[in-house]
Regions:
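C-terminal helical "tail/cap" subdomain of flavin- and related membrane-associated enzymes
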Residues: 20, 27, 35-38, 219-220, ...
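Short aromatic/basic micro-patch
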Residues: 57-58, 101, 130, 269
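Short glycine/proline- and charge-enriched loop/turn segments
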Residues: 44-51, 189-193, 235
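Conserved mid-domain beta->alpha element of the FAD-binding
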Residues: 108-109, 172, 206-207, 228-276
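Active-site-adjacent segment of FAD-dependent monooxygenases/related oxidoreductases
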Residues: 1-70, 74
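Conserved FAD-binding catalytic core of PHBH/FMO-like flavoproteins
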Residues: 34, 65-226
Length: 276
């Protein structure tokens, strides 16, 4: 999360809660797939760059937990397991599968790439499609990575690291203080197979095969005991001609309005910005 985002967390009074879970990387390093350093950002922890709003890396679940903690004093009620079956865009109001109806001054449709709200607005189903890109993620416990390990520098010097190669790129960063998240975004093309909605368990050897000739550091991390591999499909949606209702009281935001493929893993920010 860049300072523009954490500054808002600060204004909302939840930054201290986020900091309980977040990591403050020192820099971002861009490498070739073989490990050669191509470019390095200035130290993102430098107070002259980030002022009082830090650059953070945080697990999404921990971020949501912190945001949830800040809702109690603002009269926010969160209803889980609520299936929306109908939206009246003029009132505006929505109806749940239970028959309950809720009216509001404005409704924001933020239900992701498989948005039901988008289909309601367009008047027809509008499913996302896969261009053939997939994500492999390995979560590596760093507790047993010692000074003798080739990946020690990634643990000792907290940073966001990118490796860029043919057909894909990898990004790594620390989460939960002692877990290294390694994410491979890979273009498998038309042969990507059956779409996988959301992370599903995958064979670590499948990940290894994709990066067989990449930096040895990556190979060693894949082999750390306790590493867990998951995989899912990336989706896009067709470009929308409209994402708001003419009444001005309903609008789509986030992936419901503009799901796109990641570019060097800046992907979460387009959806975070309108949501914030």
């Amino acid at each position: 999360m860049a300072p523009n985002a954490t500054r808002l967390l600060q204004q909302w009074g939840v930054l201290d809660e986020v900091l309980k879970y977040a990591d403050k990387p020192e820099a971002a390093t861009f490498r070739s797939y073989q490990g050669d350093v191509l470019s390095q950002s200035p130290p993102v922890s430098d107070p002259r760059l980030v002022s009082k709003a830090p650059y953070l890396v945080v697990h999404r679940a921990d971020l949501l937990r912190a945001l949830l903690s800040g809702t109690s004093g603002h009269g926010v009620e969160i209803k889980l397991g609520s299936e929306v079956t109908e939206i009246d865009f003029n009132k505006p109001s929505l109806r749940l599968s239970t028959g309950e109806t809720f009216e509001a001054d404005m409704i924001l449709g933020s239900d992701g790439e498989r948005s039901r709200c988008r289909s309601f607005l367009l008047g027809h189903p509008d499913p996302p499609y896969s261009p053939g890109d997939v994500v492999y993620r390995i979560s590596v416990p760093m507790t047993d990575v010692t000074e003798e390990h080739v990946a020690w520098d990634l643990k000792k010097r907290s940073s966001v690291n990118f490796w860029m190669g043919k057909g894909g790129h990898i990004v790594s960063y620390l989460i939960k203080k002692d877990v290294l998240n390694i994410v491979l975004v890979y273009a498998e093309g038309a042969g990507a197979g059956k779409p996988m909605y959301g992370p599903q368990k995958a064979d670590v050897e499948e990940f290894r095969a994709k990066v067989a000739d990449w930096n040895p550091v990556i190979q060693e991390l894949i082999g750390v005991q306790g590493a867990v591999c998951t995989k899912w499909t990336l989706f896009q949606i067709n470009e929308l001609k409209r994402w708001r209702h003419e009444s001005g009281r309903f609008v789509l935001i986030g992936d419901a309005a503009h799901a796109m493929l990641p570019c060097l893993y800046v992907y979460p920010y387009p959806e975070a910005c309108p949501s914030i």
